[in-house]
Curated annotation (Swiss-Prot):
Disulfide bonds: none annotated. It holds the Pfam family Ribosomal_L31. Part of the 50S ribosomal subunit. GO terms for molecular function: structural constituent of ribosome. GO terms for cellular component: ribonucleoprotein complex; ribosome. One of its GO terms (biological process) is translation. Gene3D superfamilies: Ribosomal protein L31. Belongs to the bacterial ribosomal protein bL31 family. Type B subfamily. InterPro entries: Ribosomal_bL28/bL31-like_sf (IPR034704), Ribosomal_bL31 (IPR002150), Ribosomal_bL31_B (IPR027493), Ribosomal_bL31_sf (IPR042105). This is Large ribosomal subunit protein bL31B. SUPFAM superfamilies: L28p-like. It comes from the Bacteria.
Length: 82
């Protein structure tokens, strides 16, 4: 591997601003804010608006589009469905 071409990868705490859920992960993103993790160490804190704790796909609150296909929409629009 070449030296000095790879980004600095370090551990950070991601915090969901909607639920307060926090998890420790690796990232190249930097932050001026810091927080203490469960192991007693201090890590940079990155706040995110959506995480697996609040995203509808992961929470089971996702709604699927039940409008039908293009043909059904056309038939409904022009009253061709019988």
């Amino acid at each position: 591997m070449k030296k000095d071409i790879h980004p600095d990868n370090h551990q950070v705490i991601f915090q969901d601003v909607n639920s307060g859920y926090r998890f420790l992960s690796h990232s190249t993103k930097k932050s001026e804010e810091t927080a203490e993790w469960e192991d007693g160490k201090t890590y940079p804190l990155i706040k995110v608006e959506v995480s697996s704790d609040t995203h509808p796909f992961y929470t089971g609150r996702q709604k699927f589009n039940e409008k039908g296909g293009r043909v059904e929409q056309f038939n409904k629009k022009y009253n061709m469905g019988k």
